[in-house]
């Protein structure tokens, strides 16, 4: 596995900047179980970064719709979705190594074969590895909201990123986002509405009710009990 990732930030115009961050500084401590999963299952389910477009049929050994999840955390929801939808292929990207290890361990526990994972910067993967018009869905759940105003430019949801996602979706494919920070939800809605070629799937052109396809996380359920909100946005590529 690689030892460094390129972590995206954005300038005041929403254009991507690049800086190198090492896993050592970002990853935290691996548990024995996570390390064991990386040692045993990465050769089977892990995907190394490359600068050429990936052949999804070869990667998964079949022709099926591909769902890409950016930033899957510890992977619990991603593994659940893959288990519930064996007719789809899932590719998850996460830059934190403990999360990758935890996801691999969970995937093996439920014995799924339709999931692959990467440990690299999602922006670079999108630009270099994902073929145009190849994805049925892109999922971005609970990205860092960068609460402080002076840090808002670092949010991943900016017009250039949204346009990049659009180019990778098939016509009819969906970009699904979720956040528990209402100002970020409003920011997402504003950015998505500003980019031509998408259709908001909300009845009121704002937010959608959490679809059954997105599992309710323990953190989210606890937040709901405390009265915290979560906002889902789903936009379809129409051209």
Swiss-Prot record:
Region (Interaction with RNA): 150-155
Entry annotated with the keyword Membrane: no
Keywords, comma-separated and alphabetical: Methyltransferase, S-adenosyl-L-methionine, Transferase, tRNA processing
Protein's UniProt keywords contain Cytoplasm: no
Superkingdom assignment: Bacteria
Any Pfam family matching the protein: Methyltransf_4
Catalytic activity field: guanosine(46) in tRNA + S-adenosyl-L-methionine = N(7)-methylguanosine(46) in tRNA + S-adenosyl-L-homocysteine
Binding site for S-adenosyl-L-methionine: 69, 94, 121, 144
InterPro entries reported in the protein's UniProt record: SAM-dependent_MTases_sf, tRNA_(Gua-N-7)_MeTrfase_Trmb, tRNA_methyltr_TrmB_bact
Metabolic or biological pathway, per its Swiss-Prot or TrEMBL entry: tRNA modification; N(7)-methylguanine-tRNA biosynthesis
Entry's EC annotation: 2.1.1.33
Active site positions: 144
GO CC, alphabetical: tRNA methyltransferase complex
Coiled coil: none
UniProt-recorded Gene Ontology molecular function terms: tRNA (guanine(46)-N7)-methyltransferase activity
Positions that bind substrate: 148, 180, 217-220
Subunit organization: Monomer.
Family: Belongs to the class I-like SAM-binding methyltransferase superfamily. TrmB family.
Known function: Catalyzes the formation of N(7)-methylguanine at position 46 (m7G46) in tRNA.
Protein name per the record: tRNA (guanine-N(7)-)-methyltransferase
